[in-house]
Amino acid sequence: MPADYSSTARALALPISPLESPPSSPIQHAERPPWSRRISSGVRRAYNSASPYSSQPTTSFKDQILRKADKLQRKCITAWQNLSTLQKCLAIVAAILNIVLVALFLVYQHQIFASLAPFAERWRDLPGGWMILWAMTFVAAFPPLIGYSSTITIAGFVYGVPKGWAIVATSTVAGSTCSFLASRTILSTYVHRLVGKDKRFEALALTLKHDGIKILCMIRLCPLPYSLSNAAVATFPTVHPLNYALATALVTPKLFIHVFIGSRLGSLAGNEGMDTSTKMINYASIVIGGGLGATVGYIIYQRTMARAKELEIEELEAANGDVAPGRRVAAEYSDANNDDAALMNDDDISLWDNTDEPARYTDFVDEDEANVFASGDLDEEADIGGRGKMTRT
């Protein structure tokens, strides 16, 4: 029994596990702290999916149309519910009035065009009559006036495609430039109050800082209110008046659509003996031209706003120290400074032995030291056993 107890005591004195050598360089082998980890691929995918030019698979065109139609329906329902009773009554009256006017136009279209034909001829034969149309188009460029599209259609109705387009094109460039300068100077207070909080123009302001003349041309092609767009662009300090005039001149070919529609209306008004097939061709050309202009304008508007959103994401990433989406991640946020890591290592509590520090408590037995189990319980047991024998005797 004493021998077994002694061997058991020695076994308990042995280390529980073998001594593991500490890492040679805690800085090199330690795990990266959580604040220095790179951005995960999921986050990059989220940024890339937000970009309209990313390579992520998109939904079909049919699904996009259905989704946009559903969104438009919900917006209309919400807008209708927010109207007061008086506003709802006025909206119903306006809808009924529009239906009546369309019906009257379809029934009495020949009489309407016949009455307009002499008016167009007198205007065309009037000396300097084109200056009236030029002045009307020029004035329509200043906010908050309306009627710009009507003046272009009248130009085609009265003067036809070549001459009518030349009149409105030159007037558009001159009017837009003057409206731009006026909105930046004498009308600046009114313009900021009018369009300063418009989210559409706030988004376009960011794109102008990156894309310059290209985005200016896209803005001029967008189906935005003509006079309001002139005023809004004037609030962007990065736009130069000459660049704005150049962009307006570059997109004047779009006016051919409106002028062409006006010329077709003039043909319907001036030719009383036109057969049905010719009338149908003119009507079809009007519908196709209008639809083409609306579609192109809508597509350009969507792409312009998408570009604005992409640049907004890039600005946010640049502010946070990240890189733009869709580009190769060259360097991301990381605490790679060895000095900082060394300072952090000094503050940590190390469980490894350090030769530079005084000796600390250890569970390992030094061979030079006396075994604590060599004396103590064994001697006491021997003493107790001896006393027992003496007592028995």
Curated annotation (Swiss-Prot):
Residues 110-125, 188-241, 301-393 are cytoplasmic. It is found in: Golgi apparatus membrane. It is a multi-pass membrane protein. GO terms for cellular component: Golgi membrane. One of its GO terms (biological process) is vesicle-mediated transport. Golgi membrane protein involved in vesicular trafficking and spindle migration. This is Golgi apparatus membrane protein tvp38. The lineage of its organism: Eukaryota, Fungi, Dikarya, Ascomycota, Pezizomycotina.
